[in-house]
Amino acid sequence: MLHDDGDASVFVNRDLVEPDTIIDEERIVGRDEQLESVVSFLKPTLQGNRPPNMLLYGPAGTGKSLIIGAVTQQIIELCHSKGERFGVVQVNCQPINTLDQAVYELVQTVASDVGIEPGVPETGVSTKRKYRRLYDLINEHYDSVIFILDEIDLLVGRRANDEPAYSKLLYQLSRASNTNDIEGQVSVAALTNDPKFMENIDGRAESSFNPRDIYFPDYDATQLRQILENRRDAFRQDALTDDVLPLVSAFAAQSHGDARKAIDLFRGAGDLADEQGDQTVREDHVRESQDEIDKDRSLKLIAGLTTQKKISLYATAAVAHCSSATRNSVPSPVGFQVYQWVTEEIDADQMTRETYVKYVKELSTYGLVSTARKSRGRGGGMYMDFTFRGDPESMMHRVVDDTRLERVGTESERLHAVVNAQLREFEE
């Protein structure tokens, strides 16, 4: 039976170690310049004027969502005190595959915020109708609005040679006020890890979006430690052993200064202590939490991939795992040949070599692989070399939840033969 054992928990305010919790300005570390920029850019909203669009870019876990969230929350409260309705429509684009899905997600977000049904089905109607519903909801419930599009660079769309879905979305949203689709003031904030994001959008979208740039660098080790210190009161006063904070900071520093990972690890260690009935959080809880986070993260990322991206990942991992010579790197020509074999085995659509390489390169943004451009020597041309950051066999196992790929998993001997034949041909 369930019972209230809150007094036994190592936490007193667990929300403080939830990465999406909007925290007080006093707890923000190392982001004074970025905070001042966002405040300055959004301040016109309070005077009824249109703020500029913004591009917040920098590595993962560097405070982009934190800063934009903290400032927009303040604006919501200030507008509310004046009887004005400021809407914050925020979506994460990572799990969204198409423009149509993105527009529906925006509709759902607004509807949820104002407590009504979306009023349009997810499928069976045009994207244009979904845009219309989005604009109607905003006009009815908000006086001004900001769209926050997190991880926007991952909203690519399905057609490899078409304008990216994120480019089309930015074009429509950034001009919605000028076209009178939205009656109030509109601002768009795009958040991305990609410093070259603007190079890939259509000229019309670039002109319409025309953002103010705000760069977020990695946190250094001292800043990571201070971020954790500022959330230490999430735990009971004597619940942390002395080695917990330094170890969490060290793990986070290894992840290139990712504060989100540091906070996830901090919280996970506390959760493990609670689950095991311990009154203090120790080093072993931190290490176990780190192992679980690595596994959970890759599982979630892989589960969210499209079937074609799963096939690309599976084929590439198979080269690293099935090679008769121990190797962790995969030449793209070999990976593509194995990809072709896999698609034939499961009767799936077959993408071009360029699309295959593009899909595997995308996996580097998730931290699953790293990429390097290499040469085959004089006259041999260039190719991409993919190196797995985790165990390739584990990646394969995590992909085979796609039922069609399970069939390939049963053909272990044939898969090994195909991989090694292609490697021999490449190396000749």
Curated annotation (Swiss-Prot):
GO MF annotation list: ATP binding; ATP hydrolysis activity
Residues that span the membrane, as ranges: none
SUPFAM superfamilies according to UniProt: P-loop containing nucleoside triphosphate hydrolases (SSF52540), Winged helix' DNA-binding domain (SSF46785)
Keywords assigned: ATP-binding, DNA replication, Nucleotide-binding, Plasmid
Phenotype upon loss of function: Not essential for normal growth.
InterPro entries (alphabetical): AAA+_ATPase (IPR003593), AAA_16 (IPR041664), Cdc6_C (IPR015163), Cdc6_lid (IPR055237), ORC1/CDC6 (IPR050311), Orc1/Cdc6_arc (IPR014277), P-loop_NTPase (IPR027417), WH-like_DNA-bd_sf (IPR036388)
GO terms for biological process, alphabetical: DNA replication
HAMAP family, alphabetized: ORC1_type_DNA_replic_protein
Name the UniProt record assigns to this protein: ORC1-type DNA replication protein 5
Gene name as annotated: orc5
